[in-house]
Amino acid sequence: MEDISTIKKLEGLSVHCEDNNNNNNNNNNKENINNDDNNINPNRNATSSLLKGNIQQVKKKKVFARLHLFNRDGTVKQIVEMRKYKFIIGSDQKSTDILITRPGVYSNHAEIIYDKEVRKFYLNPLVDPSISDTIRINFIPFINKKEVLGNNDIISIGLRAFRIEFFAPVYVDNLILPKNIQPQQQQQKQQQQQQQQQQAPTAQKKLKQEVEHILTAATTTPTTTTTKPKKLKTAPPTTVASSSTIPKTTTTKKQAIEQPSKSNLKSSQNKLSTTTTTTITSKPPLNKSSIDGDTRSESSKALQGLKPKEQKKDIMKSLISSKKANTHEEKEEGESEEEEEEEEEEEEEEEEEEEEEQLEDKQKQTKTPISQNKSASSNIKPLSKTSKSNPPPLSAATKSNPVVKKITSTTVTRTTKKADTETKQEIKITKSSTTTKQQTQEEIEQELKLESIRKRIEQFINKFEKEINDNDFKDLDEGKRKIKESLDFISKTKYEFQGTTSNPGDVESTPLDKWFKNIPYEDFVDSFKLKYYSIITEPVSITSILNKLKSGPNYQLAEVLKDFKQMLINVTLYHKEPNEYWWISHQCNIQFYKSLLETGLITQDQYQIQYQTSNNEIVKLDKTLNLVPKLVVVENNDEDDNNDDEGSKKAVLVDEDEDECLNNQNNPTTYDSDGDFVTKQSDQESDEESDEESDEESDEERDQLSEEEDQEATN
């Protein structure tokens, strides 16, 4: 007994131990799960925080525009994203967004503003434009206080230029947007066009089913148990309403079938009244027995006087015309080839019907009765298989009822076919134009640059490149007239390349101002223009300087010298390596300042500074260039003016080795130690003295002759 009790106690203890172990395991599992949750939650919090940070970053990364900063050679140096509504440009490091450290640039020079309400970009100068004219939009000086910017406009401040590219939605007038950025309106139109293309075939199928249903109702007549062919010959003219005159021996089910057919025909008559009036040339005969005294329009009466076959044909024509109108609109948007095949099938059905009608007309002329089976088979062809083949009444073929005259459809079908072929050809052309090879993004950017350059340079030409007349400077002050004379003096000096000609007298020389007279535009290729005007942000020419001098009251000698210097700088900017154009530009500088010194507009010190700098460069170029140009000074020959025509000129070659020879040969021109053009005072004085002596001798001879004549008169 004791053994049994001890065994039971041991079993109870084992059970309790197992329960405790299970409880401990469960608790441990829960703790592990909690620990796992605690380990997972920080990661989740971290990811959620990262997501929030990303969202904030995305909000901060909203870009309104991009500014492409250019180097002097036209390449892109840096791209700056405009993430604010205002972008300040100047020389202050703290307050400006684009830093420009150039002379003439103020701390806050200008700002670019994006107006959110109007959705436009503006350039607002923070300095009065009359004080500082260094701001230029597409090479044109900035005049207004605030001006609207266009996409891909080039803004230059001092010698720094950059191009603005829009990213925010902008309302721009008469400007071309890039093809990869399409407005929302164009996207909506494309979606609507796609929906219409999808809905068009389904709508046409529904129309076709409705018309076929109407045709089946029109051709099926109520079957009678007692019908005699003799009565059919003397029956009144067949109309849609004449079915009421036929004796009714059918059941009520057939009467129910007649009513929807009449309603359907009435609706079809109302729909097709416009088409029947165009095809019918003479009115059909009216029925004597009117139904319930209703007064109907002429178009509905014409439909009643026609055969069921003719009604069917008119309905088919209207269907084809409506389909052609729809397909013409869809072809412009790119119609499918399946619809064109359906139209061809319908046209073939029309031709078959016309052939059957021609056979019937021939049989009528020969007075041969038409069999009912043929008429039934002719009616069954265009209809569905479920329709009943019942012969129509033959009263329309009698002599008493005149046949309705109508325009033959052969001409109509030919014209429609021609129209279809024309439209198909047009569509093929448009498809071929759309399926041309796609332009790369670089070509698109080049086209946009060319268009902006053309537009802006044409404005510059229309404003500053007008023809100059001497009469325009008569009313101006003496200082401006002297400046014009100095600019004209450059053309009197010409150049040629050494070794090109053997005889100096037969030299075909080129004026120094040939390449500076106008800015390059008309006689140059687009690739050259794109390269030139992407490097040269401030184009200047002698003609533009003269136009500004003529029209601008504040445009004086200081502004002329500044633009003239910029014109010569443009040569070195475009031609990076030394060449003959550098040589020509330095010679122009010497000749221009020489003429200004002679007119008294500048001092000797100013001239010497310019001469020394240009002459040093010319000496270097003479050593490095393969073909060294040679100056040719052109002067008016005063001694030969009486014998030769006006404007006769003499060409004199200038060279450092020939100075002594020219002096010994009594040449009217000599050159000092600096190589400048100087006239001989001794020769001029000797000429003047000889002229005075000859005048005095002639006066004495005249006095002697007059005294002798007086003495003879007194004697």
UniProtKB/Swiss-Prot annotation:
Residues 332-359, 684-715 have a biased composition (Acidic residues). The keyword Coiled coil applies. Residues 307-316 have a biased composition (Basic and acidic residues). Residues 20-45, 186-204, 215-227, 234-254, 261-281, 405-414 have a biased composition (Low complexity). Keywords: Bromodomain, Coiled coil. Residues 322-368, 437-470 form a coiled coil. Residues 474-599 form the Bromo domain. Residues 366-389, 662-672 have a biased composition (Polar residues). Residues 18-46, 186-425, 653-715 are annotated as: Disordered. InterPro entries: Bromodomain (IPR001487), Bromodomain-like_sf (IPR036427), FHA_dom (IPR000253), SMAD_FHA_dom_sf (IPR008984). This is Bromodomain-containing protein DDB_G0278469.
